[in-house]
């Protein structure tokens, strides 16, 4: 994005792989929930989240050791215009799908147009910025853009290339499990049972084994995703060896329950892994499309009523630090105190529309650690009163006597979230609010969140050191009401849109950082999400035969790292 890539044109392999890793073995992970689709490229159905990374080979691949650098995979070469107004890719000779047929420019152009018109919403925004797509040679294609946006040349390199002939006569947007996608990537779906498991096998004839970006990766023969009804069942399966790799998010369980026989005798290894990526945002999001949460003062009251310090002690022994903003734990996070310098310049035109704290400084409410949280409760009552709500006969009501109530929607398998909400409900009772808690199965949960049919729900948004066009999907106004989008809170803010636009057109690293810091301020002071704790390290328990390189990239345990750079060795 800025400057030069870290690796030279003749690099041999990525710095965080073992180019001499052996091949073989299997990795089995536990997934909570279910699935009813194998097509990760459309909105319909519930798909194992990993499939879009396994099945979507693209022109370029992202290095996990650099925020904004891509290297060739399907692309033999890439060229851009002087102002990145166009980008041209040349397809590698010999690139092939898993059925042995060659990848062609016809496949490329069909994939881009199909994904951009009837694919998942994550693909639609890019396509609207493509002015033209033209074949410029037997193995080359050029994309010309209709807006100034430095990231578009990178995004163009990261779209999955699918086999056009497989989808002839098929409604691409409506497919679920009846078609198993043919891919040019290293793995292909070998077997599956809806709602139970998906097995992916390493393609022994994979065309790209000698491509530098792929060398030393995709070493494990079978990647198997096993599905369970809840976290307890998944953990029990790991304990008895049905699963051989487990990513643990519950620090209390990590410290108290990872002492079973397989760990004691050395058959299972515990790995604690650092990373340098932002915290992202995890917590409970409020839907501003609903009347209950359209007033920022009500959202602020909900934040004050959430007794984080008490909950964190109960859930993690206070060992997990709180998320303080969307890009906290990174150089892109908002600074303490008033907005200054370039950040203030960017926000000043929108000062009248920004919420308190955006310009002058803001930090999340902090409790005293006690269960009653008296100061937080008092502030919550004060903000509710400012918004027109008071306690009448022990219940929070408006001037017309209507009670303030809302629904909290949770996913069936998320026992940790249910425990947090149980404590939150007790805190809300102290301000006369009694929410309804609804636990839905995975399919219902996805359908309702896709349609924005919720008041408050669990929210997790991983963010990187290279934010770009995806921020429009997360927080932009234009598609805020498009079903299946990612703007769950329903943000429609000219300041947010402008900051995203600025980070996309920044021509220097300093300007880019200022734009992200400004965006972080607007989002955090918008009080859309009640943040919980962050995972500033990764905790993985795995069979001793599963190994990874000593050098951990900047992004750490992130899509593209496990199982990609791991190997199995007895």
Say what each PLM segment does.
Residues 1-82, 110-113, 182:
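N-terminal lobe/hinge region of extracytoplasmic solute-binding protein
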Residues 11, 194, 247, 356-381, ...:
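Ligand/substrate-recognition segments at binding pockets and active sites
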Residues 31-33, 47, 54, 193-198, ...:
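Detector for C-terminal structural segments
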Residues 55-68, 113, 157-222, 229-233, ...:
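Gly/Pro-rich hinge or "lid" segments in bacterial periplasmic/extracellular proteins
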Residues 72-76, 98, 103, 144-163, ...:
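Aromatic-rich, solvent-exposed beta-strand/loop patch
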Residues 90, 124-168, 184-193, 338-353:
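Surface-exposed binding/hinge segments that line
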Residues 92, 175, 208-258, 300, ...:
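Ligand-site clamp/hinge motif
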Residues 132-134, 190-201, 226-290, 297-301, ...:
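Extracellular/periplasmic solute-recognition and catalytic clefts
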